[in-house]
Curated annotation (Swiss-Prot):
InterPro entries: Ribosomal_protein_uL29, Ribosomal_uL29, Ribosomal_uL29_CS, Ribosomal_uL29_sf. Keywords: Ribonucleoprotein, Ribosomal protein. Belongs to the universal ribosomal protein uL29 family. This is Large ribosomal subunit protein uL29. GO terms for cellular component: cytosolic large ribosomal subunit. GO terms for molecular function: structural constituent of ribosome. One of its GO terms (biological process) is translation. HAMAP family: Ribosomal_uL29 (MF_00374). PANTHER family: 60S RIBOSOMAL PROTEIN L35/50S RIBOSOMAL PROTEIN L29, LARGE RIBOSOMAL SUBUNIT PROTEIN UL29C. Gene3D superfamilies: 1.10.287.310. It comes from the Bacteria. SUPFAM superfamilies: Ribosomal protein L29 (L29p).
Length: 67
């Protein structure tokens, strides 16, 4: 998901997105552990997407607290 799309979501939407990405990352880690994952770069991109979503979530919470 693009950062502009993430910035348009509210706090609940961002929390849901983080949770969904974490579930996907867990599934990928299990596939890697059982040697079913062929494209291991998806682990890195998923981990970075989680970090991106968490960063925007924190920014949104701070921005709402300042208002």
């Amino acid at each position: 998901m693009n950062t502009t799309e993430l910035r348009q979501k509210d706090v609940d939407g961002l929390k849901a997105e983080v949770k969904e990405l974490q579930k996907a990352h867990f599934g990928l880690r299990m596939q890697k552990a059982t040697q079913q994952l062929t494209n291991t770069s998806t682990l890195r991109s998923t981990r970075r997407a989680i970090a991106r979503a968490k960063t925007i979530l924190a920014e949104t919470i701070v921005k709402q607290g300042a208002k």
